[in-house]
Each structure stands twice: as C-alpha cells, then as structure tokens.
C-alpha cells in the first residue's frame, strides 16, 4: 500500500501545481479521500474558487487556528492542509454573497507560503503523502480492528449507524478508512488537525483507535447507569401506584368530614379567582393537588391547608394608589408635625420623583433621635401624606431570625415572619413599613435578626425576598420603609443600606410652639374640657419647659400639660361649675404642678475670678456649664472634681500648658506654677461631664485664677483648644447657642471653623446674641477679662560677664 502511495506521488506530483488558489476553512479539516460541502462567503475565497474552476479545479484547503478572525495570514493557518478537487459549485438559496462548493480531498500537502493576488489568495505548497511502515498482514489486522471499533461506536452514538458501518466495510484501503472514521467522530479542530499532521501512520491510527475504545467504555458505563435508573423508576412507579390506590381505599372507607370538604372547595374556588404570579400559582396548584389526595382529618392536610391559606391571603399583586399631590402631602406633614424640615423635604422629594418615574424603588429612611421627638408619629403622617397603608413593626427585644423570615413548614406550629404577616394584615403590597426601635434588636443562638433585615432593606435585593415559610419570592420593592432608632448603635452593614436623618431634639421655642398647637388642644379634648374653660399662656408653657421638664422630645411636656388639664377637670366637677374659665400663667403654675423640679441655668450678675460660663450639649438640649478654678498657695498639685471624664481631664491639662506657654505675656512668673495648687471644679458633681469642647473656657478660667483678674459674667464660650491655643471646631452649636440665649448671655465666643453652622441657628437667637468667631485664645482674653494683665519685663537669657573677652576660634 505504501508503494502505491509513493507511485501515486511520483505520477501525480507533476500534475499538481506547486501554487494553487487558497481556501481558508473555519472549524473544518479536509482529509484525503474525503468529500465535503463547504459554504464559501468571503470575497477572496469566492474569487479563488472561480480561478480554480477556470483552470484545473484544484485548490489548497487548510484550517484556520482562530475561526473568528476574518483576515487570512500565514500565522493563523495550520502547517498542513489538503490539495482538493472542486466537484460542484452551487449558488446559495438564501444568500447572494455565498456559494456552496463540493470538494474532494486528494493529497496531504505542507503550506510553505501565502501569495496575495489582490482579488484572491494563492498558496505555495509541497505534497507530503503519509507513509505506512507495516506489512500487508498487519494492515489487514488493523483494518479489521478499526472496522469493529467504529461499528461499536456508530451503534452507540450515531443515528445512521447501519449505513455508515456498511460504507466502512466496503473500504479496503486502511488510510482511506482511517480518514473516513476521523470525519465521523466529534473531535475538536486541534485533534483533527493532529491526525492530518502525523508523519507516522501508526501514531495516527493508534490515536484514533484509542479514542474509539474510550468512547465504547464510556458507553458501557452509561448503559449500566441507564439500566439502574430504569429499574429504580419502575420501582418508584409501582410504589406510587400502590400508595394512590391505598389513598382511594382510605377515602372510600373513612367517615368523610363535611366541613373539611367545604374547606377544600373554598380553597379551590379562591385559588381559581386569585391574582397570583406564575411561580406562586404553580406552587399553590401543586400543593392543592396534594391536599385533595390527603385524608382531610390528617395532620398533613391541616399543614398544607394552612400553607395555601397564607399564600391566598398574601397580597402578591394588589397595591394601593399612592398619592403624588405634593401640596397636599406638604400640608399633611406640616399639620401633624412642627419642625422636622429635613425629613419633610426628603419625603416630598421622593414624591416629586415618583410623579415623574412611575416605577421607583422605595427609599429606606432611618430617623435617629432621642425619645419623644416624634419619630414614630412621623411615620404615620408620611403614610397619610402618601396614601399608603401604615404598618408598624416593633423590633425592640427581637432576638429570633424567624420573627423576620418565618419558620420552615417542617416545624410544628410554623408560621410566616412578621413581614408577610403585616402585608397580609393590610392587604396591599406597597404599604409604609415602620421598623420601630431598630437599634434595640439583639442576637442569640436562634440567629441574628439584623442580618435577616439586610435583604429586606436592600432595594436591589428585596424584589425577591424569600420567607422561610412561604419558600417563594415576594416582591418588597414597592414597600416604603422607614426605620427609627435612638442611637447609631446599628450594625454597619444594615446602616449602610439606609439614609440616616438625624433628629437632634426640639429647641425651647419649638417645644412652646408644639405645646400651643398640638399638646394643649389635645389635652383639653382628651380630658373632656371645652377650649374656653382652660387657657395656658405662653409664659406658663415656657416655664414648664424650663423648670418642670428636661428632655429632647415633648413627652414629659405632654404629661405636665395633661396634669394641669386633669386638675382643672377635678375643680370643675367638684364645684359643679358650668361657666368655668381658668387661666394658667407663670405666677399660678406652681399651684398645678408644684415647686420647680429643675433649676433654670442663668448667668451670674457679678464678675468673679476663676469663674467662666462654658456651653455644654446634652441629649436633652444645651446648657450653661459653669467652670470654676481656684489657685492657692501649695506645691504645684492639680485637683479636678465634678465627675469629669478622661477627655475633659486631658482638656484641662492642655489648657494648663497653653497658659504656661503664655506666662510671660500674661504677667505670671514661672515659679507660680511650682508654688500654687490648682483646683478645677464643675458644679453638679453627680452629673458626669466629658468632652473636649470646654478647652477655651478652661484656659480663660486658669488665666483668671493665676492673674486674679475677674471674668465678665455676661459672656460664654465653647471650643476645643490646641497646645498652641488655636480654637478648634466643636459640635452641637445650635443647642449651645440656644442655652446661651436662654441664660441671658450677651457675648458668645465660638471657633472660626463653626461659622458655617450658624445657618442652622434661628434668627431670633442670632439677633439676641453677639456671636464672635475666634481663631485662638488670644482673641478671647482681651474681651472676656475685665482688664488685661501686664506682661513681665523681658530679661536676657544669658547675662554678660564683666571683663570677659571674646572667644577665639
């Protein structure tokens, strides 16, 4: 056979030109003795076919390495290809720019060079026939082995196995049979190309036979698995048939409960009428089929029946109409709450966007503020303003994740979580959800409810919220969530999903306004009084705020107002008076509420040495903070009293250093610091005090104590100080300035960096105070002290020695 090929090469080589038109193929390898139909669409390839047809119908075909590349170059073509003969050319039925070419492979050939003829490509090649280095008997053996292996493979993998096996049995040439088989197995382009490139015939044949043997082994394993699965399916079908037969017998023999039948019929009717998403309906119908096959009195039937009722009660597609009337919404918010402008603006902004964008994911607002400032009631007002149903979910003390996500149905007494329960209660899928006290959640061995809320509060994830009980995706993207908290003690991942709006607490003027507009009319109505029977004057309300309550919100203020109303009702009932008309003023207020509960911070009338007014921020607002410093003869000891925190103690140390660095300018001899004991005291010792914002006030008080110069009583100051005496920015400026205004202060010193915060200060406060922004303590002392100390005379550091001579170097 090898001699035949060699003779064939000798005879044909002069007949095959060394340069032929080139056809580059995608994902196809053409072997000798192989016929294949090709769809040719590239312009140069079509031109190459035309050139070949006009000469000897011979072309050089070779596979591309990268089939996605449009341009043809030598680097993207394999080294070996095939000289092929064009048998037939037909135009494509549906594409004018494509032709169908039937070719027959003739000889293996090696690509040497590509020549660009402008309109088509040619290939310079060299014929490279394969050699068979085995004797005749071995060839016959290999021929039969390859036929047998291909027959096994074809019967297992190929559709037209009988025709292909018959065709293979007719082939007597081993080389031709090898190429015939290689074209019928699903090998990738790299492996098929390797078959063409093998110089040794035996290696080519062995690779192909190994592949066929591996495929036969895989087929045997697959057949074994198929038989095993078939036997198991027959067993399962038999068990299913027997179980169904048993259920039918049980239904016939059991005493059927009419009420249970009615329940099933009712569920079937509701299921047919319900508006359910496709995935929910499929699940519900599957569960209903199970229910009909069960005995109605069984516990399993009760579980399935409850599950179906929850599905049918859940508002999957029912939504309430959301109001987008901005003016009406603003009126409702203003009528229900005084102040809280940031929150109102955010709600109105959301409604404005919703009026333009029909589909908008609900915002996640988190209102953080002290108790009693109206966080929860604000949620109700927002629901009313937007036309949404209102749902309040208290999270205080919740420790179990199942409270949020529900229990799985496998547990006895399982039920859905509070999210699904609340939606079922209101009957719509777009309510306003108020998650109250979100900072009060805890965790234990039952799970972490805060982590369960991560999915609920993420707008990009809550469209597919999965409750453990339902085990179905529920869309929460149209729910508007508002969370409330007293502090920022919220898990970081949860906090990141929310837009935090801080409610710092009401100012004194805001509390008075709220009492006049809301609390007093409410107390009169709730206690059965008529408006003309009780009048509480503004100065009395202000007195209640200052001397009977100390809070950031208005709850205690409401209690005190209600207390007055109850006493008035008692007086009216006891006297049986029909024309009762009482005025509550600042003068007669103690008759109703008793003596004052709190001292109202007021500035001193006289200037004192070592005593200065600081300004403090507390959870219930701002206060005047008196700072007292006494300097007495001693040994340089430093004493602090008044329940001071570590930060304030460090601030005192810093202030002392600031004074010592300015000792000469302030007229303080250096020895004074070693011979004087300093005592810093902040009155109301039972109240803990901390923070760095008293630095400027402490420095001023220390200067006054060491110099003996008094400090003006009508000034106050706030600000942290650096070692160089620079005034540094502080927080809570609004509350502090309100306290200064309330306490009769005339001049307030604030750091220069806090000027930007003055925009938040009410105009009546700014008009009643002289606010001076300073950069350092040096700007405060001339205005705060009643007089400036005289600096010490400057003395040279080194005194000259009489008669000394200049040093020589």
UniProtKB/Swiss-Prot annotation:
Domain spans labelled Lon N-terminal: 20-216
Subcellular localization, as worded in the UniProt entry: Cytoplasm
Signal peptide: none
Active-site residues, record numbering mapped to chain: 693, 736
Reactions listed under catalytic activity: Hydrolysis of proteins in presence of ATP
Purpose of the protein: ATP-dependent serine protease that mediates the selective degradation of mutant and abnormal proteins as well as certain short-lived regulatory proteins. Required for cellular homeostasis and for survival from DNA damage and developmental changes induced by stress. Degrades polypeptides processively to yield small peptide fragments that are 5 to 10 amino acids long. Binds to DNA in a double-stranded, site-specific manner.
The keyword ATP-binding is assigned to this record: yes
GO CC, alphabetical: cytoplasm
Keywords recorded for this protein, A-Z: ATP-binding, Cytoplasm, Hydrolase, Nucleotide-binding, Protease, Serine protease, Stress response
Organism: Acinetobacter baumannii (strain AB307-0294)
Induction: By heat shock.
Pfam families, alphabetized: AAA, Lon_C, Lon_lid, LON_substr_bdg
Claim: rRNA-binding is one of the keywords in the record: no
Listed PANTHER family: ATP DEPENDENT LON PROTEASE FAMILY MEMBER (PTHR10046)
Protein name: Lon protease
UniProt-annotated binding residues for ATP: 369-376
Subunit structure, as described in the record: Homohexamer. Organized in a ring with a central cavity.
NCBIfam families: lon, PRK10787.1
GO biological process: cellular response to heat; protein quality control for misfolded or incompletely synthesized proteins
InterPro entries according to UniProt: AAA+_ATPase (IPR003593), ATPase_AAA_core (IPR003959), Lon_bac (IPR027543), Lon_bac/euk-typ (IPR004815), Lon_lid (IPR054594), Lon_proteolytic (IPR008269), Lon_Prtase (IPR027065), Lon_prtase_N (IPR003111)
EC assignment: 3.4.21.53
GO molecular function: ATP binding; ATP hydrolysis activity; ATP-dependent peptidase activity; sequence-specific DNA binding; serine-type endopeptidase activity
Ranges for domain Lon proteolytic: 606-787
Main location: cytoplasm
